[in-house]
Regions:
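Alpha-helical transmembrane segments and their immediate juxtamembrane cytosolic regions
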Residues: 1-300
Length: 300
């Protein structure tokens, strides 16, 4: 995600968009815990966890945009409504509103035994751009597709033992499937969940899920190789504190890129340096927001 926002070329952008946002919804479903609380209580819990960071960091960037480009109501209207269109700087916060509605919908459908509705809702999300004249507010189109991915993630977790071969593929098989997956992704059109673009829908689902399962196996191989190292602990912290990275990465990249432009860093290495410096700063921010009283800003 951070590399995508730094920008490493059109091909890289196309490849990661095929799976990186689907992966966030899948992972959220994989980590989902069954709750006995009522829907109202759940809404309150999820609003604190997801909507407080959404409005804090989205609002902060709207204020900053007003300071830089002049006061305008458009960023605020989009923050409160069409949040996939234009939220300045930290546009990625759309995911928080999408995940909020995905989690509420999933819990409601499972609570009232309407799980079968997940499939038509996910299909509607894939077709929303073609069926509707305007994007749905609050990233609801992406939320509908995310509901299907969330379900797959949770079902994968429940069936982890029976899916052990799929979730623990050997390195050689992973590399072969990576080549196949890359070819399929490049064969398909451009994918962007935020913009409700899915090109060939069956191929979108195949590519997204294949990428995710390859990623799970590779992550286990990498973790085993890096066991008990600082890098392993750092990577775990990125996943644990991912909301900080979602909310802050574009803001950090914005200032780091502006600084590099000011000092005249060579173009050949600029993107790599921006990525490295941004990740260091983001790690510092994750420590700040998770270990101090500022944790309320990220819904803790």
């Amino acid at each position: 995600m951070v590399m995508g926002h730094v920008g490493f070329g059109e091909m890289f952008d196309k490849v990661i968009h095929a799976f990186h946002m689907p992966m966030f919804f899948f992972a959220s479903g994989f980590l989902h815990k069954e709750r006995t609380t009522g829907i109202r209580t759940l809404v309150r819990i999820k609003a604190k966890k997801l909507l407080i960071p959404y409005f804090v960091f989205g609002g902060m960037c709207c204020l900053l945009d007003g300071r830089i480009n002049g006061i305008s109501s458009e960023p605020w209207r989009n923050l409160l409504w069409a949040n996939t269109t234009y939220i300045p700087i930290a546009g990625a916060v759309w995911f928080l509103s999408a995940l909020f509605f995905t989690e509420i919908a999933y819990c409601a459908l499972t609570k009232y035994k309407w799980r079968l509705m997940i499939f038509p809702i996910a299909l509607f999300g894939c077709l929303a751009e073609k069926l509707l004249p305007y994007p749905l507010p609050w990233a609801l189109g992406a939320s509908c597709v995310g509901l299907g991915l969330y379900w797959v993630g949770h079902e994968t977790r429940k069936r982890e033992a029976s899916l052990k071969h799929l979730l623990n593929m050997p390195l050689g098989l992973c590399l072969i499937l990576c080549m196949l997956d890359g070819w399929l992704i490049l064969t398909n059109g451009y994918i962007n969940m935020r913009a409700e673009k899915y090109a060939n829908i069956p191929l979108f689902w195949l590519n997204a899920l294949l990428s995710i399962y390859i990623g799970i196996s590779l992550s286990k191989i990498i973790q085993s190789a890096l066991k008990d190292t600082f890098i392993e602990k750092w990577l775990i912290s990125v996943g644990r504190d991912s909301i900080v990275y979602v909310c802050c990465n574009q803001l950090v990249i914005y200032f780091v890129a502006a600084l590099f432009k000011h000092v005249g860093i060579a173009d050949a290495c600029e993107d790599v340096l921006i990525l490295i410096v941004s990740m260091i700063i983001l790690y510092g921010l994750s420590v700040l927001f998770t270990r101090t009283k500022l944790r309320f800003l990220i819904g803790k």
